[in-house]
Amino acid sequence: WAKRSDPDGRVPIVAELLSQSNEILDDCVFKEGNLPTGERVVIRTGLPGVYWRALNQGIPSSKSTTAQIDEACGILEARSEVDKDLAMLNGNTAQFRLSEDTAFLEAMNQTQAETMFYGNPGTDPKKFLGLAPRYGDLSADNAVNILNAGGSGSDNASVYLVVWGDNTVYCPFPKGSKAGLTHEDLGEQTVYNSDGTRLQAFATRYQWKNGLVVKDWRYVVRICNID
């Protein structure tokens, strides 16, 4: 408590030294998915054949080829439990809980931004597939959009150029759900400590359902191995 109050017993404004500027969350396009679990997209994989013809000659019919892909959304969730008596010590319960909310909101933002780049269901099935695994193989079909800067260090960086749009790259949220981060005040509850003892606490639930769809791989370029 002493670290979370000023000499007058009030809750001060906490210096958010761990905060980050995640412009990608402001830049990306959010769109309601067509599935309760995410988005089903149809991607064109081949163009129809077209022909030059001469007079009195016919041409064969042709058609394009497509593929269906289901992009699943991930569920990012956190729960805050603040000791009721601790929150009431300074006489401003709402302000104390708000100072705790700020930390959770920042953590949710940072995790979403990180997953948008590095999420990999192959190593963690609960996450959605991010940009780096999609554009991480220089021998893949989309390698034409991966530019190798040639760095050989152990801490190389990448730059991603993304054209956001409903038909290019966007972030779906499950059909019938809310976009973005939701905040639910669960009120006063009896909670358990790690030693099994109980106490009264104010509980808050945070949730963010989100995914990533690259409908047209040509609208993302990765410049990798920047030393």
Regions found by a protein language model. Give the residues of each.
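Core alpha/beta structural scaffold of self-assembling particle/tube/pore-forming proteins
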Residues: 1-26, 39-42, 64-227
